[in-house]
Regions:
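Conserved ABC ATPase "signature" region
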Residues: 80, 99, 103-126
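Catalytic Walker B motif of ABC-type/P-loop ATPase nucleotide-binding domains
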Residues: 155-159
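ABC ATPase "signature
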Residues: 214-215
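Conserved ABC transporter NBD signature motif
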Residues: 59-70, 74-75
Length: 252
């Protein structure tokens, strides 16, 4: 399958602090790729480099076939980014937010684009309310809808459920799963182990600036034998895998 993202030897330092220490991974088209790591592991730094908001110090990164260093404008045309905090204009209504982005992308029929996305995200009834009146889950749904204006092939979701209650988080998970049905590639960063377990086709664990393990959930589970309790095999959870891998690397 064709690669949507390819990263080799990515390095980045801030002053004397080396944040990325030679990161390698690839993301196939149409899959959900979860970059899992604790706070300060370097997840957001990777997202900022891949979305052309930050220059790497070394290594290469290609997004949708374009080098982020030499073809940043082509990369930006191929992607959308939703950060940890909603980038919604709270003074505008939900519909007005979407129309504004559609106009900025020079799309035909901005209102039609807005109405279609409002329907897809279950926001039609709230379309003419100011975004400031939306719940956290509704605001996040609108934020993700904004990222879909223009149908970018690759979407970066940087900790998209930070600050949401469990019910709103499940709402967002459902939306993310549905996005890949249309062939969209999702690059997801999260510190929620359950989020990666629920959503990801591929998981990479980032720790202190390095990818220390990667693969499908089943492949990661094979790194650790199942525990036996009362003659029943208990498969390791992603949380147990994460803590075991990070703990091993931390002791080295």
């Amino acid at each position: 399958m064709e690669k949507a993202i390819e990263v080799k030897g990515l390095r980045k330092s801030f002053n004397d602090a080396e944040v990325l220490k030679g990161v390698d991974f690839e993301v196939k088209r149409g899959e959900i790729f979860a970059l899992l790591g604790s706070n300060g592991a370097g997840k957001t730094t990777i997202v900022r480099i891949l979305t052309t908001l930050l220059k790497q110090d070394g290594g290469t990164a290609f997004v949708n076939g374009f080098d982020v260093s030499s073809k940043p404008e082509h990369v930006r045309q191929s992607i959308s980014l939703t950060g940890q905090f909603a980038a919604v204009d709270e003074i505008l209504t939900g519909r007005e937010n979407l129309i504004m982005i559609a106009k900025l992308r020079y799309l035909n029929n901005p209102r039609q684009v807005a109405d279609s996305l409002l329907k897809s995200f279950g926001l039609t009834d709230a379309a003419d309310r100011r975004a400031s009146t939306y719940s956290g889950g509704m605001r996040r749904r609108l934020d993700i809808a904004l990222s879909l204006v223009g149908n970018p092939p690759i979407i970066f979701l940087d900790e998209p459920t930070t600050g949401l209650d469990p019910e709103a988080r499940i709402e967002v998970w459902k939306i993310v799963k549905e996005l890949t049905n249309n062939g969209t590639t999702i690059f997801l960063t999260t510190q929620y182990l359950e989020e990666a377990e629920q959503l990801a086709d591929q998981i990479a664990i980032l720790n202190v600036g390095r990818i220390i393990a990667g693969g499908t959930l089943e492949e990661l589970k094979k790194l650790f034998p199942p525990a036996k309790a009362e003659y029943v095999e208990k498969q390791p959870t992603l949380e147990e895998i994460f803590l075991a891998i990070v703990g091993k690397k931390g002791r080295k």
